Amino acid sequence: RRQRQMCIRDRSQAEHDRLASPVLVTDSAALAKAVQAELEVQIPQLPRAAIARASVDDNGKIILCTDLHKAIEACNIIAPEHLEVCVEDPFGVLNEIKNAGSIFLGRNVPEALGDYFAGPNHTLPTSGTARFSSPLGVDDFVKKSSFLYYTREALGEVAPRIADFAEREGLHAHAKSVTIRYEK
């Protein structure tokens, strides 16, 4: 039953398009083997079997890790758009997960639940960009400004370095904008 569930998870990624990257990361050799066999049974049953087959053949991976923590490290490197954490205690490993667009915790949270019903949104970083990007959120619609304040003394301490940086870049007016404040 578990390999069928895991296989369906991979299929649901594979049927998106030929460029999809269905990946299973596990620390169980038995599960990896069972999912591989189950994919061969289930893919032909899909209406979009040709797309799913191409996706699995060209971009699909089953990554076998020595332990759960290595599996999480692999997931952080992959930085998937969707990450289904199907372990006994998903909340126990949540703090280790740093790079995923949307994280589905537990065996009762299929991707379709997040896509169509309960997810916070479906605009997620793809192609590993979850390493440096976040899902679309409220912060994307809030205008912000940054603020900077230095005292005359604090600026004086760093002014020579700033001027040096600016001159090395060939931006002499930038350098002068700092040094002019200290001319007599």
For the regions a protein language model found, what residue spans apply to each?
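Structured catalytic cores of enzymes that bind and process phosphorylated ligands/cofactors
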Residues: 1, 19-21
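Short, small-residue-biased leader/transition segments that mark boundaries at the very start
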Residues: 1-8
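Short acidic, glycine/serine/threonine-rich loops at helix termini
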Residues: 9, 34-38, 116-118
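Active-site donor-nucleotide binding/catalytic segment of nucleotide-sugar enzymes
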Residues: 11-17
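A glycine- and small/hydrophobic-rich beta-loop-beta segment
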Residues: 16, 24-100
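Catalytic cores of large soluble enzymes that bind and process phosphate-bearing ligands
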Residues: 23, 27, 31, 63, ...
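C-terminal core of ALDH-fold dehydrogenases
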Residues: 77-184
